[in-house]
């Protein structure tokens, strides 16, 4: 993968109640990724940026809701999420500041 593409694939971690439960129980982490990202690209990006071993990647496309506004109907953004399972004994700490 081209070095510049690594930084564009991952948009950031997806923090939610479900993501926290999955991280504690199964060693999975949830990331928001670009819509055109593939599973091998996501795996390479996470292994390069966080220096961990990725076991598997599952993705889902979450369609944005249609909402009513003063000017009519509007639509929220579509989001692609990646559920990443790390190898046994590996973890990612998002709170570390170096």
Curated annotation (Swiss-Prot):
Pfam families: Ribosomal_L23 (PF00276). GO terms for molecular function: rRNA binding; structural constituent of ribosome. It comes from the Bacteria. Disulfide bonds: none annotated. GO terms for cellular component: ribonucleoprotein complex; ribosome. Transmembrane segments: none annotated. InterPro entries: Nucleotide-bd_a/b_plait_sf, Ribosomal_uL23-like, Ribosomal_uL23/eL15/eS24_sf, Ribosomal_uL23_CS. One of its GO terms (biological process) is translation. Keywords: Ribonucleoprotein, Ribosomal protein, RNA-binding, rRNA-binding. Belongs to the universal ribosomal protein uL23 family. Part of the 50S ribosomal subunit. Contacts protein L29, and trigger factor when it is bound to the ribosome. One of the early assembly proteins it binds 23S rRNA. One of the proteins that surrounds the polypeptide exit tunnel on the outside of the ribosome. Forms the main docking site for trigger factor binding to the ribosome. PANTHER family: 60S RIBOSOMAL PROTEIN L23A. This is Large ribosomal subunit protein uL23. The lineage of its organism: Bacteria, Pseudomonadati, Pseudomonadota, Gammaproteobacteria, Oceanospirillales.
């Amino acid at each position: 993968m081209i070095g510049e593409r690594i930084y564009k694939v991952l948009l950031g971690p997806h923090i939610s109640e479900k993501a926290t439960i999955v991280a504690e129980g199964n060693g999975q982490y949830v990331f928001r990724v670009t819509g055109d990202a593939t599973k091998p690209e996501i795996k390479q990006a996470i292994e390069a940026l966080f220096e961990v071993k990725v076991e598997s990647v599952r993705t889902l496309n979450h369609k944005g809701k249609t909402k009513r506004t003063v000017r009519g109907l509007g639509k929220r953004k579509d989001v692609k999420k990646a559920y990443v399972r790390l190898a046994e004994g590996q973890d990612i700490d998002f709170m570390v500041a170096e």
